[in-house]
Regions:
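A short glycine-rich, Lys/Arg-flanked "PGG" loop and its adjoining helix->strand segment in the class I
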Residues: 147-159
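A short acidic, Gly/Pro-enriched loop at the edge of an enzyme's catalytic core
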Residues: 121-132
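Conserved SAM-binding loop of SAM-dependent methyltransferases across substrates and taxa
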Residues: 72-83
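Conserved beta-strand signature within the Rossmann-like core of class I S-adenosyl-L-methionine
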Residues: 160-168
Length: 229
């Protein structure tokens, strides 16, 4: 529910910008980086990640991009400045939205980038975007509402648009309680308790792909970037 999500986000993210900056660095990117070599710094790998997204999204100037679950707004600000994209970020984390707004101002892209502090369920439907990104936010939606959320993303996307989804999950296992599979079970429980409070990252890749295709998406490519964590 929206009430539950606000409670979880407030306890996990709000008023903790200093804490997150200690291990996320100046770019404040919470999702996986992308290391081209083991000698790269965290900031280099974070920038690699953004540029990889831009490449996969086939971004061009004046694209209209919606980032659902924009965190501290780094992707929104970076793509607006370096790719000339018109970006809109969505988050319910007040502290993150304030950081993002300040970052947009520092990047000098107030005319191209903005952040809405609203629940993803309340994203206006009167406008469509030709590019949509969702980086490790769908886990917070949960299994029950995942397909409905994917349908929402599909409906917000232009007919020839591109949707970039990054999502965490477990490997396909018939019985997680078996001794040989308990590592995945423990990983999932740890993530839910300490990393993504209230989130569900328990489903295998084929589960995600099936639901993407059922709402109308055509899957163009899949890349496993788990080792970059």
């Amino acid at each position: 529910s929206q009430k539950q999500d606000k409670r979880i986000i407030k306890s996990h993210y709000d008023n903790k910008n200093d804490l997150f900056s200690w291990f996320l660095g100046s770019k404040m990117i919470y999702t996986s980086c992308y290391f081209k070599s083991i000698d790269e710094s965290l900031e280099d790998a974070q920038e690699n990640k953004i540029n990889l997204i831009a490449q996969k999204m086939q971004l061009k100037e004046d694209d209209e991009l919606l980032d659902i679950g924009c965190g501290w707004g780094t992707l929104v600000a970076h793509l607006a400045k370096h790719y000339g994209v018109n970006t809109t970020g969505v988050t319910i984390a007040q502290a993150g939205a304030e950081w993002a707004t300040r970052q947009i101002r520092e990047y000098g892209v107030e005319d191209r980038a903005k952040v809405w502090t609203i629940d993803y369920r309340d994203i206006p439907t009167d406008k469509k975007y030709n590019k949509i990104t969702c980086l490790e936010m769908a886990e917070h939606v949960g299994i029950k509402y995942f397909k409905k959320f994917m349908k929402q993303c599909y409906d917000l996307l232009e007919d020839d648009g591109i949707f970039y989804l990054q999502i965490a999950g477990l490997r396909e296992r018939s019985n997680l309680l078996q001794k040989k599979n308990r590592e995945d079970l423990v990983w999932g429980l740890f993530m839910n308790e300490y990393i993504f409070s209230g989130a569900d990252a328990s489903m295998p890749l084929n589960w995600d792909l099936q639901r993407l295709e059922k709402v109308g998406f055509e899957v163009h490519s899949v890349e496993n970037i788990g080792n970059h964590y």
